[in-house]
Amino acid sequence: MVRKYVVAPHGGRRAYPDISSALRAAAERRGPALIEIAPGHYEESLTVRGEVQLTGLGGPGSVVVSPPRGTVLDAFGTVRVRGLLLVGRDADVVDCLGGSLTLEHTEVRAHGGVCVHARRASLVTLTDSVFRYGRTLFAGAGGSIERCGFHDAADNALAVIEGARVSVRDSRFEGSRIHGVRVSDAWAELVGCALTGTEKAAVMADTRAELTMSGCRVDSVHAEAVMFIEQSRGLVRGLRVSDAEHGIGVASGADPVVRDSVFADCRDTGINVQTTGRGTFEDCEVVDAGSVSVFSTNGGAPRVNGCRVTGGNVGVAVVDKARGHFTGVVVEDLSGVALRVFDESRAVFEQTRVERCPAGLEVRGNGGTTAQLTDVRITGFDMAAVAVTGEARVTLTRVSAEHGLLGFGVGEEASLRVQDCDVSATRAGGAVAFGRARLVARNLTVTGSEAFGLCGTESAYVDVADSRFEDCAAAGVTFDESGGGRLVNCSVTGARGMGVQHNGRVDLVSLHTSLPVVERVPEPAPPAVQVVNHHYHGPVFNAAVHGVQLAWNNDEVTQRIIEPAPARATPGTTPRATPGADRRTIQELDDQNGATP
């Protein structure tokens, strides 16, 4: 039988003046107790033991329990709290030492402390409640949270650590100084939750955590919406992210599965996998990412299947010794390159479609940089569908490029292998090799190029067999400068341009064409022009010179004539000039850089 106790601030008939006195009375009688609390402000700390229910009478916030310092509610047993406002400072406002604790329609405010601390082996249920300023901590405990709000936490709004297991449904987290939810070496499930305004990752899984998210929304956060690190695992389904720095981040050995999620208007990246992180991303969409939509870097290795990238700058980037496997990816309407592989990275693209992007695939790096494309279609590009430079190695199988500037280009010391590929309706050419690059093609078809079909220039080597070049405006095949190679069983058809224009460094084996084949041996370079430099630093004399004054490099010359004073005549004599003293000419040369010998 449940005994009922009534608490009123000023006492009354059969009423207790404070909550603590009612708790003492219930403890003395033992058994289940229901304590009904009238509206008022109670400055006391509550210690609850046994099976007790505390219920506030009146509207929300009418029953306030707020001691000056310390814990507000210390619970051990089977405790239920309903309709109270608990306010504490510099301590755990609610501390569940063991047993079970349920908070319903309750508000907890922690000024400088923890809202709720669920300790090991306890079970805490939070329903229709609000938690402000402090974090809610499950340390080795079990818990369930439904329809709760977590506001303006000074650190993490909800922390699930040390093997705890917590399920969170239909709750909201906003304004946390660190994370909205942190799961560390524990298990947590978030269903239908909303997170906003966090200063770090809205949801963080670290230290081998297990995190499941379904139907959640994250917006307006300063860092990642969701972050998996340190070998954490989990499943994320139906996540909607907007206005985050990064949509989802994976690092340091973490390996989540992410499905059916949308990352929109991320300021930097949509999907970011780094530092040996992995992850499987299926049927996701990245919209208008500020920098890179899907980013694998520094040893990252994601698997991306059936995803769509729309708008933004760069579509998929695999850089800095990273890897990536991409299947069924659609990339469209970007302002930058669609696919990028740099710096000792390795990427595989299968059944991928690129539309309306300035460039298709861009590969650059040393010999450890590789890309493989199979069943890929690239259309509507402004530059090259495929561009390979450095020492990178790329293999194309059943790749089509249409309606752009250049189909396939390989330069410097890179290598490009082409098998069963098509290039059509390009403005500058079908395929080109330059520098000291190597292009090997089998069953390549180039149609409707406004310039050439195939070009080898500088010192490139081109090996093409069983290929067709149709209706190319300038030439089907052209070799310039020192470029060389061979054409085996190839055909050049059309009604315009030349069939083959070469430099004598290419082997033509079984060439089929009705168009002209022209050999143009490069003219030898003209001899070097002899350059004679004359240096005029002073006068040059070709014979003896006497009685001259010389000056050079002068900016100003001043000449002054000084007349001697007339001699006085004595009576009876006639004045006469003194020889050599009639007139004296003095030249003064005024130049800081001048010289007068």
State what each model feature region is.
Residues 1-28:
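Right-handed parallel beta-helix/beta-solenoid
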Residues 44-45, 57, 84-90, 109-113, ...:
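Surface-exposed loop/turn segments connecting beta-strands in extracellular beta-rich domains
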Residues 53-56, 79-82, 101-105, 123-126, ...:
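All-beta strand scaffolds that present successive hydrophobic residues in beta-strands
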Residues 122, 130-204, 209:
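Solenoidal tandem-repeat scaffolds enriched in leucines and small polar residues
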